[in-house]
Amino acid sequence: PSGSMENTIMTGDRVIGSRLSYKFHEPERGDIAIFHFPDDPTGKTLYVKRIIGLPGETVDIVDSQVYINGEPLDEPYIREPMDPEEPMHFEVPEGCYFMMGDNRNYSSDARYWQNHYVAEDQIIAKVLFRYYPFSKISWLDE
């Protein structure tokens, strides 16, 4: 992964994802997912981001705060507030998800993509575990 998920996942970390997770359960807000980047027509580019918006929800970003359906989202994994930007509004279509990196000021994520939403069939795994570096082995799905 790139630096977009720091400090949760650092550049150079290695993770294990489960392809089976989403065979039995729908993706949930807060999951860290591996998915096909929606702006890559070849479908070969994989991204790792956190699921923020679920199907049918609205996502607003105002004064560095993320709101889901008008309610502020509690994000204890964020290391620093987002740099101020113009307010943003997104309406997540059914069958799609809105993804953001934890390192918001250095993340190329759904806020800036041409195709803002990731279709459920583009999500290939839920990140469960960091196995490298060995000194930082840990579960990431808690």
Predicted regions and their residues:
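Aromatic-capped interface at the extracytoplasmic side
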Residues: 1-5
